[in-house]
């Protein structure tokens, strides 16, 4: 599917730094570029610029893994009127609040909706 950047409702880009998913405010660089891999059955894996995987653990925490962790590293990209939501195996969405903190939520709302850019 190719390289993507994801900009939150609050203007922050998802970013992978120091083995954590964070946000950058207002701009994007190599830390904010993710490679989206199609894994069939409407599921994708999201790899960082350093070839690590975005994942959600059993406690619903978003983390970066050095290895593909099966269902923990698979997501469904839901498209909503030109925006995208990133839904994990556990039916939780990756979200970014107004302060740029990353969390997961079971509810689909504006914090869990991103602009998707092809990079």
UniProtKB/Swiss-Prot annotation:
Keyword annotations of the record: Actin-binding, Cell membrane, Cytoplasm, Lipoprotein, Membrane, Myristate, Phosphoprotein, Repeat
Protein modification: Phosphorylated.
Sequence repeat boundaries on the chain: 34-47, 75-87
Molecular function in Gene Ontology: actin filament binding; fatty acid binding; protein-macromolecule adaptor activity
Chain positions covered by the region annotation Contains several HHXH repeats: 8-110
Principal subcellular localisation of the protein: cytoplasm
Gene3D superfamilies: 2.80.10.50
A GO biological-process term: actin filament polymerization
Function: May act as an intracellular pH sensor that links chemotactic signals to responses in the microfilament system of the cells by nucleating actin polymerization or stabilizing the filaments.
Protein family: Belongs to the hisactophilin family.
Name used for this protein in its record: Hisactophilin-3
Species of the source: Dictyostelium discoideum (Social amoeba)
Lineage of the species this protein comes from: Eukaryota, Amoebozoa, Evosea, Eumycetozoa, Dictyostelia
């Amino acid at each position: 599917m190719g390289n993507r950047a994801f900009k939150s409702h609050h203007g922050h880009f998802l970013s992978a730094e120091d083995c954590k998913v964070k946000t950058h405010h207002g701009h994007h660089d190599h830390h904010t570029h993710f490679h989206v891999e199609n894994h069939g059955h409407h599921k994708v894996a999201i790899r960082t610029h350093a070839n690590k995987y975005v994942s959600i653990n059993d406690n619903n925490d978003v983390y970066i893994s050095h290895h593909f962790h099966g269902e923990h590293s698979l997501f469904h990209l839901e498209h909503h009127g030109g925006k995208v939501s990133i839904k994990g195996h556990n039916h939780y969405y990756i979200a970014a609040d107004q302060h740029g903190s990353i969390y997961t939520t079971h509810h689909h709302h504006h914090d869990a909706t991103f602009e998707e850019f092809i990079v």
